[in-house]
Amino acid sequence: MPMKYANLSASRISFKKWFCLPVTCLCLLVTQAQVSRYHYTTDKKAEGRSGAVVSAHPLASKVGRDILQQGGNAIDAAIATQLALAVVYPGAGNIGGGGFLIAHLANGRNIALDYREKAPAAATRDMYLDAKGNPRLDLSQDGHLAAGVPGTVAGLFASMKYAKLPFNTLVRPAIDLAEKGFAITASQAASFNAHKKEFLKLNTAPTAFVKDKEWKAGDLLVQKDLANTLKRIRDKGPAGFYEGETARLIVEEMKKGKGIISLDDLKQYEAKERTAMAFPYKKHLVITMPLPSSGGIILQQMLKMIEYRDIKNMKFQSAASVQLMTEAERRAFADRAEFLGDPDFVKVPVQQLTDSLYLAERMKDFEPGKAGNSKTTLAGTVKESEETTHLSVIDAAGNAVSVTTTLNGSYGSRTVVSGAGFLLNNEMDDFSVKPGVPNMYGAVGNEKNAIAPGKRMLSSMTPTIVLKNNKPYLVTGTPGGTTIPTSVFQTIVNMIDFGMTPGDAVNKPKFHHQWLPDELFVEKDFDAVTLQQLKAMGYKINARGDIGRVELIQVVNKKITAVADKRGDDDAKAY
């Protein structure tokens, strides 16, 4: 570490409500977006009337808020925030992964951008099976072969046609943070230390995330190779990533670990603009992501399965309300496993799966007071990571943006492209490696989500915007693998049905059921009396760590309330 930063290494920071380092003399004034990498606060709630950004890291939220204050719109802020997250939140923020964007523009137009990763052209259906046909999940989850063709950079530039500011302005703060470094948080230090062995095992060259001594809160993370990659993207647009030097470095990295992404795979990647899903729920309009995200379909199914039941009077986290929502989750995930896949490759009966009569039929065998059974509750009959990151943005004009991006697992494949400084995803594990075999999140699938060259793997990401009286009311989403749609589901119900404040809707304990395994996952601070009642109904309870990290913006009478989840370093900024 350079001598001028040595005092930072010894700094101890309590990262509860604030994060401060006494080195303001080193703060750099950056034209357009001022970023202090050594001194930044973490705000779990922010209010304003002009705009707001909520993301997984305080510096990224500040970058986005600054872009809004400089005259950028919500799309500008979302792009700049994503780029900043690629630097300051390397566990999931990325340029080596993919994601989805949902936007509702002030002119009433809805936008759905799909920049999900794709299987390389050399991918085969059984590429992760051994000679006996048994799955090798280490190959689909770890290292070079686990990586799909990245889509994030293509997604950023596909967003630019709705932006106001030049890309150079939007990427500048990220370049600065990567080149000069920033002070890491306590949780980031712990995460780097916990993953050190994997970084060493899965990389052929030193990475910025490994050093001889243990990381501590306040240490500087400098990523010069990443800064240079961002500069190439700044100067050459998408070609700065998908062609030229960066593409060469990606392919060279592939060769070191038997990866299969080629120059042609990179050059041929395109983001897709799809038709956003939009459906009513109790006098609100929910706008969310279509396939290849399963999240939108699952969310619609779950909300519609409970819409005409009196959940409001069941009360929040009562055994009755949790049971009702759990059984909706069970049925939606059973359908996910059976029917969903990339719509460009397989026929998916979306209209039937979201039909009100079909969903009523799905809940016909629901018995209040008695747990369902995933052995008998199968997919319906039709006629035909958790390491992700989310950001929510709104601007003064009423443009709202909800973005979820991912590397899949924490730090993706844990493989850094040598010389380019960014992590590759391990999204190939989101395919059905073998029908009925669960992925790292326990989700199962069948042939509809089987591996095929150029195919997009099924996702659970659920970026969502809720309108009230045709104007943005909620902008929300979360990381969390298969817990994403259930966390968004519960947050919407908390707000609309239970009338919670945004803070309570985000931070109250959550639960999750995904059909298989047939277990009800709950956070450790879940109500003990309710748990006993659920056990008496026949549910197998599995207490676990955090479920979701929701980023929520609410707009009421032009007052903006932005809330960042207490479960991480997440941060809200507004003005």
Question: Which ranges hold each PLM region?
Answer:
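Active-site Gly/Thr loop motif
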Residues: 261-282, 357-383, 424-463
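Bacterial Sec-dependent N-terminal signal peptides
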Residues: 1-36
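Active-site rim segments in enzyme catalytic domains, especially the processed small/beta chain
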Residues: 87-112, 260-262, 400-468, 498, ...
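Alpha-helical support elements that line or immediately flank enzyme active sites
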Residues: 68, 154-162, 236, 240-243, ...
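Internal maturation/activation junctions in enzymes
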Residues: 308-407, 419-420, 435-436, 444, ...
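Extended C-terminal subregions enriched in glycine
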Residues: 455, 497-545
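Noncatalytic scaffold domains of N-terminal-nucleophile
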Residues: 34-62, 74-75, 79-236, 241-243, ...
